[in-house]
């Protein structure tokens, strides 16, 4: 497997995944919505280029999305609803100036890619990042996408927090692929792949995935579990992440890390005002006025945790 995998027309097969799965849109009518406002989405991320379904378009919107729409988990941390309905996602992430976690981010991105004319398959992954050695295999709790561009499959993912991809990757194993940030690579594993990134010259795993297509209900189950399970870290820890052209911002409770030019600056946000300011400035969030949010920020500001990304 030393060459980029191709969609073989007309059968369109990738590692045994048939055309009805690989093409995406016919297989998943639930993800095609006339209620999606492409103009508003493109304005939100600051894209004014071509709307042709080309690799240049895909790379451009993939880079802009994580800079404009950050990863954040305020809703589950506050016990607020996390809806995956496209109208709710547009109200929150587009019109509302908020961010979200992987399901919100990649479902929104999926609708944008559909509207631009791309053929997309919905995938799921098991997270490996920061998992201690010998950790039991976790659930498929992360969403990513497979995008067909002129017969070539690309992995797209705008929702993986502090190490989010900022460029789609060819589904081509063993090759280090540059991004606007760190190099990434895919390694074959069992019937799927492991995604790794290079940190300080060392390759580290992020997640493993197969090409088995996912239905909207699959994401609803994982979304509900992460929102409600008492041991879900998203109910216990404030997390924020944003990838800008000049670096990465990562927030874990009251610890802010700024990764830029191969250096990392860390600082403690010692009160609720500093936390709110960072969320609004560093993470470009429009925060609601809420006594619950104010109380949570005050509580989190008294913690001390090291950011992992």
Identify what each model region corresponds to:
Residues 255-309:
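Extended, charged low-complexity segments
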């Amino acid at each position: 497997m030393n060459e980029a995998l191709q969609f073989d027309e007309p059968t369109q097969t990738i590692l045994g995944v048939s055309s009805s799965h690989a093409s995406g849109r016919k297989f998943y009518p639930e993800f095609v919505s006339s209620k999606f406002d492409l103009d508003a989405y493109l304005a939100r991320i600051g894209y004014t280029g071509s709307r042709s379904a080309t690799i240049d378009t895909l790379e451009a919107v993939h880079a802009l999305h994580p800079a404009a729409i950050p990863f954040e988990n305020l809703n589950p941390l506050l016990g607020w609803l996390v809806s995956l309905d496209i109208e709710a996602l547009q109200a929150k992430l587009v019109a509302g100036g908020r961010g979200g976690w992987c399901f919100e981010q990649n479902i929104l991105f999926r609708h944008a890619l559909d509207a631009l004319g791309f053929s997309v398959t919905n995938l799921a992954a098991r997270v490996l990042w920061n998992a201690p050695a010998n950790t039991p295999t976790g659930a498929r709790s992360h969403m990513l996408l497979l995008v067909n561009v002129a017969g070539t499959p690309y992995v797209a993912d705008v929702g993986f927090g502090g190490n989010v991809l900022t460029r789609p990757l060819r589904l081509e194993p063993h090759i280090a692929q540059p991004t606007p940030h760190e190099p990434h690579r895919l390694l074959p594993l069992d019937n799927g792949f492991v995604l790794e990134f290079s940190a300080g010259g060392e390759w580290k795993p992020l997640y493993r995935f197969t090409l088995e297509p996912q239905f909207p209900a699959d994401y609803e189950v994982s979304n509900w579990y992460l929102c409600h399970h008492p041991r879900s870290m998203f109910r216990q820890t404030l997390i924020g992440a944003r990838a800008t052209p000049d670096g990465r911002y990562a927030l874990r409770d009251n610890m802010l890390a700024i990764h830029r030019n191969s250096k990392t600056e860390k600082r403690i946000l010692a009160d609720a005002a500093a936390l709110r300011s960072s969320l609004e400035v560093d993470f470009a969030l429009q925060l609601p006025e809420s006594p619950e949010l104010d109380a949570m920020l005050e509580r989190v500001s008294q913690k001390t945790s090291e950011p992992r990304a």
